[in-house]
């Protein structure tokens, strides 16, 4: 499985959108620095995805994610491919017996296909939106994640160089 975290919050960036010819769309903006973080792990072969929304990107939250991931797949041995974030390599990180961490080289997000899942979630639920509360951000994030099917995850993350390793 490939793992990563992404921040979703109340700061929005206007994106292109459709409108009638001759009409300039109005897109409100917020610059409120409140975030929640989606921790996720995806399997490009099966299309399995596991996500958890947590308040921070740190070792404590990564430990919570690993605990839940381990419990969700108790009979599987998971090779979890991560980037080199500090909390992935912390001395206080608890790695469970059914999980082994592997790391992609530094500064190579293109090697982590879950990055495209974050892009898809933002496109589906966050473009040109203003959220009045952080709870509304979390609600939208949860609903958008729930709409991801196995087929969608497979099609977004199933890169040929990954799939060829399992054929």
Tell where the protein language model's regions lie, with residue ranges:
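Short functional hotspots at interaction and active-site rims
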Residues: 1-167
């Amino acid at each position: 499985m490939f793992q990563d975290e992404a921040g979703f919050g109340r700061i929005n960036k206007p994106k292109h959108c459709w409108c009638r010819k001759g009409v300039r769309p109005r897109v409100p903006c917020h610059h409120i620095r409140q975030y929640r973080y989606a921790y996720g792990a995806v399997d490009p072969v099966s299309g399995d995805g596991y996500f958890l929304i947590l308040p921070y990107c740190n070792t404590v939250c990564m430990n919570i994610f690993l605990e839940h991931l381990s419990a969700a797949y108790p009979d599987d041995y998971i090779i979890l491919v991560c980037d080199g974030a500090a909390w992935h390599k912390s001395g206080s990180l608890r790695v469970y017996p059914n999980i082994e961490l592997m790391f992609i080289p530094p500064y190579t997000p293109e090697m982590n296909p879950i990055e495209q899942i974050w892009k898809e979630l933002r496109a589906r639920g966050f473009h040109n939106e203003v959220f009045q509360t952080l709870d509304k951000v979390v609600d939208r994030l949860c609903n958008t994640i729930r709409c991801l099917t196995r087929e969608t995850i497979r099609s977004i993350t199933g890169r040929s160089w990954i799939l060829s390793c399992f054929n």
